[in-house]
Amino acid sequence: MLAALVAGAADADAASATAGSGAAATPDRARYDVTLRSDADGAHWTGRERVSFRNASAEPLREVYLRLWGNGEDPCGTSGAPSPVVVSHVVGGTPGPLTVDCTALRIVLPEPLARGERTSVAFDVSLTVPDRNARFGREGASRFLGNALPVLAVHDAKGWHLDPYVALGESFYALASDFRVRLDHPSALKVPATGRTRTLPGAPGRTVTVSVADRVRDFAWAAGPFRTATRTTPGGVLVRSFWAADTPAAGVELTRTDAVASIDRFGQEFGRYPYGELDVVMTPEFGGGMEYPGLVLIGTTEEGGAVVHEVAHQWWYGIVGNDEYSSPWLDESFAQYANFRFQGWDTNDCWSDVYWPDDNATLTASMAYWSQQRGQYHLVYTAGPCALADLERTLGADTMARLLKEYARDHWYGVSTTEDFVRAAQSMTDVDLGPFWEAHRIR
């Protein structure tokens, strides 16, 4: 995400969870089968979602949690304005009350799920797009459905990850999963989405957009009377562009050009883009940009937008995953470092320009910290890439390039941590990098 950094943040206190003895992240190998139907303008979607999953932990899995991130801005709503995301008619388990400001739903399984076994839960889902310009929101006739679809929470050695929603950045932590999604909508609406998409005729005046997405961490889509164009990159990636009619034409062209160039370049630097298709959605007033697997939302002016940063997120968060609440620098700083290099910006002295609010502040702080220091959150986008640029100068450009490509390979579709990266970097040199990490507040 690259935003104006002026949004308000939700509560910073993470929900407590008891750590279990089974360290493997679970439930894993999830598959989501979703069928939704929209109203006339794409602002309301209803249907059914089924998710099957495996227990990867050594411990029996007795429950799962759904994250209803779309409720994050509105928590539990009011009697006159209920929460935007509603789950009902659950089968395959017994639902409890909503918790964590109505962003978490516990479902107790009928019997403990042993290691390696699979089961599924299914439920009705209702999504009402909020009246705000945001990743789950709207702008004019455009509808954005980012983080709208309920997804499984993750349990690992730290317990269940039930962190609060933050508007300032991201709270999201998900394992790579498969999605099969059918979106039934008026034919006047174009519906870009995560995955490889195709359209089928529906009822009179309606179209069904069908998407298949494998090994992705989330599923997002947009809907609107978009103008469209497609390009295939020299590397073979289909880039589909969608833009609102009032988006500046010059900015649209710049954004499309940068999307095509950056996805191929990052494929060479970090590993070939595996999803085949990227949808780029542009509107004139969207705040900055927001990344999802195979889909980016870009606020686009005459000068273009933050598309290069968001394309870089396809690797740093999408392919190489991380817990975005506990370690936001692992995706934001890495994506911005890739952006700096793509743009050719001079980073020789940028670390010396960094101002830290206090001696204890660290680049590797969690969103619990940044939510309380909103004016300093820009450091993830400024100090972070500067630190990585300094690491490049310390290791040498060729070694840094090899580090990132091998690091991406070793964590492809997995989850990375700061400790993983520190170990990987140290393995590339005989020089003790301890003083480097300390000086750059990577702790």
Annotate each PLM feature.
Residues 282, 293-352, 404:
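Zinc-dependent metallopeptidase catalytic helix centered on the HExxH motif
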Residues 1-46:
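N-terminal, polar/Ser/Thr-rich
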Residues 62-95, 146-149, 184, 188-189:
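Solvent-exposed beta-hairpin/edge-strand motifs
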Residues 69, 121-220:
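Extended, low-hydrophobicity, Ser/Thr/Pro/Gly-biased non-transmembrane segments
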